[in-house]
Design a protein with these regions (language model features):
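Beta-loop motif signature
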Residues: 1-42
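SH3/SH3-like beta-barrel superfamily modules
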Residues: 32-61
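Boundary regions of SH3-family modules and the immediately adjacent low-complexity/disordered segments
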Residues: 51-78
Length: 78
């Protein structure tokens, strides 16, 4: 389970932001940290919900793990 973990992205990585009925591709640049909020779920092992800055995105779990490096979270959060 990746929930609660933080990853420093070493390469630009694509995420999807869902706003109402619309989905928008968002490129998260290398050097940014994403926090896994949820996932992957047993019925969908491919996607995770992440927080990046003030956005909530859906990303491919494999992309986050292969293009990122797990780092400690903010103090008190792991």
């Amino acid at each position: 389970m990746l929930t609660g973990k933080h990853f420093l992205l070493k390469a630009p990585t694509l995420g999807i932001e869902i706003v109402g009925d619309y989905r928008e591709a968002v490129r998260v640049p290398a050097g940014e940290i994403v926090e896994i909020l949820e996932g992957p779920k047993p019925d969908d092992k491919r996607s995770v919900k992440v927080r990046w800055r003030d956005k909530t995105l859906v990303m491919v779990a494999d992309d986050v793990q292969k293009r990122g490096e797990e780092v400690p979270g903010p103090r008190g959060n792991g």
